C-alpha cells in the first residue's frame, strides 16, 4: 500500500491494523497530513459492511464543526473502500481512563459543553450518532473534543442506514429505546448515551457489570432500572438525571453545564471527590484486586479497540459487526 494515492494523498506509513480496517498516515503534495482508513480485504467483499463503511463516509464528509473530526474525501484503493480523514494526535477518553488519568472538573465541564455543541449541530441537520461512548470522544493535543466514528449514525433526511436483524451500538451505553428497537431511535438516544458516558467518566465505574450480569440482564436493566448515580458530585447528579429518563420524551434539550448555576439536590451526602479532580481509575501504582481486573476486562469486551494514534479508526466492537461478520 505504501506509495498508493487517493484523493491527492500519498500513503506514507501504516499507523495500525484493527479488526475492520488498517490506517495509514498520508500527505498531499503540500505536505498536509491525513489519516486514511482502508477496509480490510475480506470485509470489502461483505456488502452490508461496505454499505456501513460508506454510510460513515457519506455522513462525515458533509459535517463541518470544530468538535467533529473532518472527512476530506472517500473512494477506494485497489478495490477496497477508503476514507481520507483529518489526522489527529491525542487520545480518546477510554484510553485515558485505562491510563489512570485524573481529569480536572474544569476539563469535564469543557468536554461536556463541546459535546453539546457537536451534537446540537448534528441533530440540527438530522443526524443521530447512536454510538456515543468514551472511545468515540477524542481529546486532541489542545485539550478539545473531537467526536469520532459515525459508522452507525442514522441520517433522518436520507434513511436510517439500519440493517434488518442487527443490533446497533455499544450495549452498556445504549438508551432504553435503542435496546428495544434501534431503527426507531431519534436524537434523544444520543442524550441518554452522553449522560451515561459522563457518569462513567465522573465515577470511574462502568455503567453495568458484565462479570455478574448476562447481556439480557444488562438490557433489561437499561430498560427498567434507574442507573446508579450515587457516586456523582451533587451538581452533576442533578444535572445528568433528566437525561437518564427511561422515556425519551421526558429528556430535556441538551444544555451546557455550568458548575456555578447547576442545580444541587437537597441530599447532603458527602462526595468522595475533591474540589479539583475526578479520579477515573485508581492512580498509577495502586494495585487492583483480581475481581476488579476481571470486571474491567469483561466490561472492555463491550467496548474494545486497539490503541494507537488513530485507534478510533479501528474500533471493531459494534454489535453489527458481530452480526454480519461471522
For the regions a language model picked out, list residue spans one by one.
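Conserved short submotifs of the Hanks-type protein kinase catalytic core
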Residues: 78-92, 96
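Conserved end of the kinase activation segment
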Residues: 177-188
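Activation segment signature within eukaryotic-like protein kinase domains
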Residues: 111-112
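Activation-segment/catalytic-loop signature of the eukaryotic protein kinase fold
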Residues: 74
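AlphaC helix of the eukaryotic protein kinase fold
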Residues: 40-62
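Protein kinase catalytic-loop region centered on the HRD/HxD motif
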Residues: 117-127
Amino acid at each position: 500500500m505504501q506509495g498508493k494515492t487517493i484523493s491527492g494523498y500519498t500513503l506514507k506509513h501504516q499507523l495500525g491494523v484493527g479488526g475492520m480496517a488498517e490506517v495509514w498516515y498520508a500527505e498531499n503534495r503540500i505536505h498536509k497530513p491525513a489519516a486514511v482508513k482502508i477496509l480490510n480485504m475480506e470485509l470489502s467483499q461483505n456488502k452490508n459492511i461496505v454499505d456501513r463503511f460508506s454510510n460513515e463516509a457519506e455522513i462525515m464528509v458533509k459535517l463541518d464543526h470544530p468538535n467533529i473530526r473532518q472527512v476530506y474525501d472517500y473512494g477506494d484503493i485497489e478495490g477496497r473502500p477508503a476514507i481520507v480523514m483529518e489526522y489527529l494526535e491525542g487520545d480518546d477518553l477510554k484510553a485515558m481512563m485505562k491510563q489512570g488519568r485524573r481529569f480536572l472538573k474544569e476539563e469535564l465541564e469543557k468536554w461536556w459543553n463541546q459535546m453539546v455543541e457537536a451534537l446540537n449541530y448534528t441533530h440540527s441537520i438530522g443526524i443521530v450518532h447512536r454510538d456515543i461512548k468514551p472511545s468515540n470522544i477524542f481529546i486532541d493535543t489542545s485539550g478539545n473534543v473531537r467526536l469520532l466514528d459515525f459508522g452507525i449514525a442514522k441520517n433522518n433526511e436520507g434513511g436510517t442506514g439500519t440493517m434488518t436483524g442487527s443490533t446497533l451500538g455499544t450495549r452498556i451505553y445504549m438508551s432504553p429505546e435503542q435496546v428495544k428497537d434501534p431503527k426507531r431511535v431519534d436524537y434523544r438516544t444520543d442524550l441518554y448515551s452522553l449522560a451515561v458516558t459522563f457518569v462513567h467518566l465522573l465515577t470511574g465505574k462502568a455503567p453495568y457489570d458484565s462479570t455478574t450480569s448476562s447481556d439480557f440482564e444488562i438490557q433489561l436493566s437499561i430498560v427498567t432500572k434507574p442507573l446508579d448515580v450515587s457516586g456523582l458530585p451533587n451538581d452533576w447528579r442533578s444535572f445528568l438525571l433528566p437525561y437518564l429518563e427511561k422515556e425519551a420524551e421526558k429528556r430535556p434539550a441538551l444544555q451546557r453545564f455550568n458548575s456555578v448555576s447547576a442545580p444541587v439536590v437537597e441530599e447532603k451526602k458527602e462526595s468522595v471527590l475533591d474540589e479539583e479532580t475526578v479520579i477515573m481509575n485508581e492512580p498509577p501504582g495502586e494495585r487492583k484486586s483480581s475481581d476488579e481486573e476481571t470486571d474491567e476486562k469483561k466490561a472492555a469486551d463491550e467496548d474494545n479497540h486497539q490503541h494507537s494514534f488513530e485507534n478510533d479508526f479501528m474500533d471493531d466492537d459494534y454489535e453489527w459487526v458481530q452480526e454480519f461478520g461471522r
